[in-house]
Each structure stands twice: as structure tokens, then as C-alpha cells.
């Protein structure tokens, strides 16, 4: 398969170049305008709903747990390795464009969450089933059934061969071996047993674990980064100025940094931002559909906070640490670059802290994508296919530490991009429904506030 690598790389570069990025950002801009800057005006309400949502109505898990499952899949190696790669190639200006992708992506994520709840249904066991394949088919009509099926097939392929397995497994075993000297085989066996024990229990088991790990790992990583930022607090204005200046003028070569143009900063920042927060890819609404709620718009608001937490907070922390410590123009790249920034304050312990963060991020990503793939299999083949899917997924985790097939990873990137296309078509086609539901919900909120006066 590696003989096809040049062809696959060319397709990957084209797909994740101007066409898809334009469609992703364009959809976010369209929804931002039609929803009257919902990600700004109603962000405080959205953040408040995370912990005080009513959790009444149809659904399998609470709104908070649904958000944690989505964040489990979203917060991954991209928050560490992806940001470092974007800054290494595109310069500090890539961070600004990452923010822009997240800003417009919040409106996209809101629409995904709303539609997921509005068009969800129940499976043969009475459990909730929802996501893009359902709002494409039920919202756009039966004639778009092939588009829904295409999305579901792409989701299964990404869960099996892309984000959900090999890259995450390799990130865990590599980092644990490097920092703690634990054999890859031992780590892989332990990881496989853990994943099997959790995923065999289905959504409720995954949601329970995610609800415990996600807050802990997010706070841990933020605290580590804040420690470094505080040590350079006087340099923050200069760092922000560098980020803004580089976003519009490019960055000259410095040290191990080869220099970048405005287009390089824009393309890498937006692409890595989208990879990290998954706004528009259609993955998060699969989890959102399972939330206990009567209000589609309310779950949309909660879903929107996922992009805010993932990119505006966590990715920004990584980016600021890289710029403030000067690690971005060193000779390292990827996780090693972030590791250099961590060790600048914490010494050798910094490398261990990074390993723990990376392992937790990758572990929860596996859990989240296991669920996404399972829901896609359910749509394609029904309940009878779920157990075989889980067994294959666990087998791939067991093999993941020993497979380094670059062509498969590039193919997974391509399929990941192809996931987004039917989802974005649906978001644009159903944007009128999103606007109508939003106005109806906000009117009820205003009436409720008026009646309480």
C-alpha cells in the first residue's frame, strides 16, 4: 500500500487545502451571520448550561456526559502535537488563524448539536441513535439516503484506521516507553484490556469514564501551562503582538524555524484548528444526540462549548507556552517541541507531565471514536453488528502499537475529510431549520425570564 503513498499524499493535500477549508470556514461564517453571532451573545448561557442543564426528556445520558464523550474524542494529540506542528510550519501567526477557525466553528458545532437532537431516533434496544446520518436522511429526505450512508461508512473507516486507533495507540506507547522505559508490549496489553473493559459496556460506560477523566486531564494540562505562562507574564503582550503580526505579515526565519508566509500561517492554523475541535466534521453530534433534553437548541449551546474548551482554551495554552518559551523556533517539532517548553520550567518532570497529558488525551480519544464508529455501524447494519464491531476495534487496538503504515494514516486523513463534506452539505441545507429552532427557543427563554419578574 505504501507504493500509493505519493498519490494519497497529493489527494490529502488537495482535500485539506483550499476546497475543504473554504467549505468548513464558509459554513461557519454563514451560520454565524444567520444566527446573529450566537457564539458571542449566548456563550455565557452555554457555559452555564454545562452544569445546570435540566436533563429531562428522551436521552441515554446527561448533557454534561454527552459533552464529555464529545470532548473525549475531540481533546487529543492534536491539542499538543497538532498545535506544535501548526506553529512550526506556519509560525506564531497560525495560532491566530486557529482562533478564527474555532470562533466560526462554534456556530457550526451549535448547529450540529441542535440538528442531532431534533432528528434523533431510537434503535432496536430502545437506545438513542442520532448524528449527521440521521439528520441528513430525516431532515433532507429519503432521496439523500446515499449521502447519509456515505457519511456512516467514512465514520467507521476513521474509527478503525484513523483518529480512533493507530495514531492514538502509537502516541501512548511511544511516550510511555520514552519517559518511563515501559515496554511497548506491556503498555499495549494494558491499554487493550482497559479499552475492552470500558467499551464493552457501551455508551453509559464510556460516558462515566469520560465524565471522570475529561475534567481532571483538562484542568491538569491547563495548570501545567499556566505555571509556564506566569513565569513569562511580562512577555505576554509581546507574544500576543507577535501572534497577530505574524498572522498578517508572515514570519522570518529564526533559529530552527525556516520562516513562513501569511498563507502558510492561515492554512496550517485553520487546518489544525479544525482537526483539533472537529467542528463541521460531524463527529460530535453523534454524542450530542444521546443527551437527555427536550430542547435541541439547548444541547446545541452545550455542544458549542466543546470547541471553546478545546481550541480557545486548551490549544491556546499550548500555543502561548510555545511562543513564550521560544520553543517554536528551536530545532524540535511536534510533541518534542512542547516537551522542550515544559522542561524549561519543570525540568525532567516536565517530560513526564507531558507524557501523562498526552496519554490521557489519546486514551479518551480512543473511547470517543469507539462510540462514534459503533453508532455508524448501527445505522448501516443494525444492532446485530455492534458486538462484531467492538471485537474488531479491540483487535485493532492490540495491533496498533506494531503497525506503522503511513499510507493508512494518510488514507484516514482523506476519509476524515470526506466525512465533513456530507455533513456540511446538510448544515447548509438545514440552516433555515436551525435558525427557526433557535428563535423559538430564545423566545421561550425570554418569555420565561419575563414571567419570573
Where are these regions (language model features)?
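Extracellular/periplasmic helix-exit of transmembrane alpha-helices
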Residues: 32, 112-119, 124, 226-242, ...
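Flexible loop linkers connecting adjacent transmembrane helices
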Residues: 37-63, 85-87, 91-95, 99, ...
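Alpha-helical membrane segments and immediately flanking helix-loop junctions
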Residues: 57-89, 115-139, 150-153, 157, ...
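Extracellular loop-to-transmembrane helix junctions
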Residues: 12-45, 88-126, 147, 310-317, ...
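Transmembrane helix-loop junctions in multi-pass membrane proteins
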Residues: 3-4, 34-39, 78-83, 159-173, ...
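Helix-loop-helix module between adjacent transmembrane segments
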Residues: 27, 31-32, 104-126, 133, ...
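N-terminal alpha-helical transmembrane segments of multi-pass membrane transport
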Residues: 1-77, 87-94, 105, 398, ...
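Membrane-interface loop-to-helix entry segments
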Residues: 23-30, 38-47, 169-176, 183-244, ...
Amino acid at each position: 500500500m505504501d507504493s500509493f503513498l505519493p498519490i494519497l499524499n497529493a489527494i490529502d493535500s488537495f482535500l485539506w487545502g483550499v476546497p475543504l477549508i473554504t467549505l468548513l470556514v464558509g459554513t461557519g461564517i454563514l451560520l454565524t451571520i444567520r444566527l446573529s453571532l450566537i457564539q458571542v451573545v449566548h456563550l455565557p448561557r452555554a457555559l452555564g448550561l454545562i452544569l445546570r442543564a435540566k436533563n429531562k426528556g428522551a436521552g441515554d445520558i446527561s448533557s454534561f456526559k454527552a459533552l464529555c464523550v464529545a470532548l473525549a474524542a475531540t481533546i487529543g494529540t492534536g491539542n499538543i502535537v497538532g498545535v506544535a506542528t501548526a506553529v512550526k510550519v506556519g509560525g506564531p501567526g497560525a495560532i491566530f488563524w486557529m482562533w478564527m477557525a474555532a470562533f466560526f466553528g462554534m456556530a457550526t458545532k451549535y448547529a450540529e448539536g441542535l440538528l442531532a437532537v431534533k432528528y434523533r431516533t431510537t434503535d432496536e434496544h430502545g437506545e438513542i441513535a442520532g448524528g449527521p446520518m440521521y439528520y441528513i436522511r430525516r431532515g433532507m429526505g429519503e432521496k439523500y439516503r446515499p449521502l447519509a450512508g456515505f457519511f456512516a461508512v467514512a465514520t467507521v473507516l476513521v474509527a478503525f484506521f484513523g483518529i480512533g486507533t493507530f495514531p492514538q495507540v502509537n502516541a501512548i506507547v511511544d511516550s510511555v516507553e520514552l519517559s518511563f522505559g515501559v515496554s511497548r508490549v506491556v503498555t499495549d496489553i494494558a491499554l487493550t484490556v482497559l479499552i475492552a473493559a470500558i467499551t464493552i459496556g457501551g455508551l453509559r460506560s464510556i460516558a462515566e469514564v469520560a465524565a471522570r477523566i475529561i475534567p481532571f486531564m483538562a484542568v491538569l494540562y491547563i495548570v501545567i501551562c499556566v505555571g509556564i505562562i506566569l513565569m513569562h507574564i511580562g512577555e505576554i503582550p509581546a507574544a500576543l503582538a507577535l501572534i497577530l503580526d505574524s498572522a498578517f505579515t508572515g514570519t522570518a526565519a529564526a533559529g530552527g524555524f525556516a520562516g513562513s508566509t501569511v498563507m502558510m500561517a492561515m492554512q496550517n492554523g485553520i487546518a489544525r484548528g479544525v482537526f483539533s475541535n472537529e467542528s463541521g466534521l460531524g463527529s460530535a453530534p453523534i454524542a450530542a444526540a444521546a443527551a437527555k433534553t427536550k430542547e435541541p437548541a439547548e444541547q446545541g449551546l452545550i455542544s458549542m462549548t466543546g470547541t471553546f474548551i478545546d481550541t480557545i482554551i486548551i490549544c491556546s495554552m499550548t500555543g502561548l507556552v510555545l511562543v513564550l518559551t521560544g520553543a517554536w523556533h528551536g530545532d524540535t517539532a511536534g510533541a518534542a517541541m512542547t516537551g522542550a517548553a515544559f522542561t524549561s520550567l519543570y525540568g525532567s518532570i516536565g517530560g513526564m507531565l507531558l507524557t501523562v497529558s498526552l496519554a490521557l488525551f489519546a486514551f479518551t480519544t480512543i473511547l470517543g471514536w469507539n462510540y462514534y464508529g459503533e453508532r455508524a455501524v448501527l445505522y448501516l447494519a443494525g444492532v446485530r453488528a455492534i458486538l462484531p464491531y467492538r471485537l474488531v476495534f479491540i483487535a485493532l487496538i492490540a495491533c496498533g502499537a506494531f503497525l506503522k503504515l503511513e499510507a493508512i494514516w494518510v488514507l484516514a486523513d482523506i476519509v476524515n475529510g470526506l466525512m465533513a463534506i456530507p455533513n456540511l452539505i446538510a448544515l447548509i441545507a438545514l440552516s433555515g431549520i436551525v435558525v427557526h429552532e433557535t428563535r423559538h427557543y430564545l423566545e421561550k427563554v425570554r418569555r420565561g425570564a419575563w414571567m419570573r419578574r
